[in-house]
Amino acid sequence: MSIENLKNSLPEYAKDLKLNLSSIARSTVLNEQQLWGTLLASAAATRSATTLREIAEEAADVLSAEAYNAALGAASIMGMNNVFYRGKAFLGGRYDDLRAGLRMQIIGNPGVDKADFELWSFAVSSINGCAHCLEAHEHTLREAGVSREVIFESLRVAAIVAGVGQAVQSTEALAAAAV
């Protein structure tokens, strides 16, 4: 199992992450598509090739092809949107009257349940640190009737995967440097 491979690759100092990853992979708060889509989108957002490969391998066995692509699509489109809207927010409203002019059709037609896509976008926005997008996706999820518990669990998944990605990158960098 690839989650097992990922857990086994974590060093002793990341024991909490190993335990959290075990726990979150068995979440009953999220349905299977929500969980594995959030895991996959979050892994893509970490920019850790190993984390993405290991989670993607298992996600491919669980998710439909449409959900797999939509989760990666959420990570990709949020990679653009989070930079744009976070940057725009730093400018203190001086550009709020200008149109974004960015193509974002996947958000309107993700190929899966829109609430699931929003959940994955919410998770990625938390990893990428965009308060504007995080709040917008949370609002859309609440309007769609998604419970606070489901939204919060998605945030937990994102946090754990982000921490795992950081630990994996540190471990790989130190191994490459023979430290």
From Swiss-Prot:
Alphabetized InterPro entries for the sequence: AhpD, AhpD-like, AhpD_core, CMD-like
The protein's Enzyme Commission number: 1.11.1.28
A molecular function GO annotation: disulfide oxidoreductase activity
UniProt key word Oxidoreductase: yes
Active site annotation, chain numbering: C130 (proton donor), C133 (cysteine sulfenic acid (-soh) intermediate)
SUPFAM superfamilies noted in UniProt: AhpD-like
GO biological process, one term: cell redox homeostasis
Disulfide bonds: C130-C133
Similarity section: Belongs to the AhpD family.
NCBIfam families the UniProt entry points to: ahpD, ahpD_dom
HAMAP family for this protein: AhpD
Protein name, as recorded: Alkyl hydroperoxide reductase AhpD
Chain's gene name: ahpD
